[in-house]
């Protein structure tokens, strides 16, 4: 996805191609997590990065995908936006209004948690399910009253002007993005997966050690203005990819339960069944 900084930089610098010259590396971009996990489930791709919600929907639908790692949370990189002159001043004011977001995305979770914090239910708003590009158009045209979205779309809207941040992810206790793979692939390629993820962490570190060069490269690759990329980097913490520990798994379980309670997923899921842990042997093979 456009927001996967480490992956985009790794691709731009051909880090995986250099690390694994005998392997054929293919890169595929998706507009959002749900579409990516569909491709992962049918074997079109081997590894993908997505927000916290798409894996829950995929698991509920029976996809045999596993969480192989997680990034730290980025609470400042995901927001609910309203027009600058909107009468909506608080999340509670969203009651009865149209809110655009990608169904089954991390922004879906941001919205649900923000509503709960404000004493509202999901049924108190008018959800409008749209892809980021379509949501942006609907928001700009005034066809929806608010837009829950992640970076870099958020930074692009912010710098274009005429918007106000109603709420970001601060104090909403979300996880960071996850990396997922099909279970059979993960079980057979553990060492390779670990090496790939380590490469992504190295690539992400370039946003700090080579900030200006990285901004220029990301702007060119993503087709976005450099100020948008700079804003996005300012919204995110250093991103080192780590295994999914018990605390993260428990937080993701809380999220899954929240979506089930709101009848947004058809059945309960057990996140612990989908956590993949590299073995010591696989670690030594690196």
Features from the language model and the residues they span:
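Secondary-structure end/capping motifs
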Residues: 187-266
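Extracytoplasmic "Venus flytrap"
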Residues: 1-13
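Pocket-lining segment of extracytoplasmic ligand-binding domains
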Residues: 53, 124-128, 132-220
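A bilobed periplasmic-binding-protein/Venus flytrap-type ligand-binding module shared by bacterial periplasmic
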Residues: 9-10, 78-88, 176-191
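Conserved C-terminal helix/tail region of periplasmic/extracytoplasmic solute-binding proteins
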Residues: 257-286
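Beta->alpha turn/N-cap motifs
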Residues: 3, 31-33, 44-56, 61, ...
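Short helices/loops that flank or line small-molecule/ion binding pockets
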Residues: 34-48, 60-62, 92-95, 117, ...
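Short loop->beta-strand "edge-of-pocket" segments that line small-molecule binding or catalytic clefts
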Residues: 1, 92-104, 201-205
């Amino acid at each position: 996805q456009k927001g996967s900084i480490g992956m985009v930089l790794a691709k731009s610098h051909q880090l995986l191609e250099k690390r694994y010259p005998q392997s054929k590396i293919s890169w595929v971009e998706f507009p959002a997590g749900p579409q990516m996990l569909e491709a992962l489930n049918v074997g079109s791709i081997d590894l993908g990065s997505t927000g916290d919600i798409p894996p829950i929907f995929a698991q509920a639908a029976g996809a045999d995908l596993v969480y192989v790692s997680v990034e730290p949370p980025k609470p400042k990189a995901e927001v609910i936006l309203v027009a600058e002159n909107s009468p909506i001043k608080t999340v509670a004011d969203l009651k009865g209004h149209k809110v655009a977001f990608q169904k089954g995305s991390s922004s879906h979770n941001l919205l649900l948690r923000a509503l709960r914090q404000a004493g509202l239910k999901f049924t108190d708003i008018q959800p409008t399910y749209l892809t980021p590009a379509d949501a942006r158009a609907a928001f700009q045209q005034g066809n929806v009253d608010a837009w829950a979205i992640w970076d870099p779309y958020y930074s692009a809207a912010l710098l274009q002007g005429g918007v106000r941040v109603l709420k970001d992810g601060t104090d909403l206790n979300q996880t960071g993005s996850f990396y997922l793979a099909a279970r059979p692939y993960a079980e057979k390629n553990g060492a390779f997966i670990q090496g790939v993820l380590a490469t992504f962490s190295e690539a992400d570190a370039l946003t700090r050690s080579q900030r200006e060069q990285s901004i220029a490269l990301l702007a060119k690759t993503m087709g976005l203005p450099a100020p948008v990329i700079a804003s996005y980097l300012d919204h995110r913490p250093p991103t080192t990819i780590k295994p999914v520990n018990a605390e993260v798994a428990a937080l993701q379980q809380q999220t899954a339960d929240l979506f089930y309670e709101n009848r947004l997923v058809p059945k309960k899921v057990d996140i612990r069944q989908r956590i993949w842990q590299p073995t010591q042997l696989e670690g030594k093979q690196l």
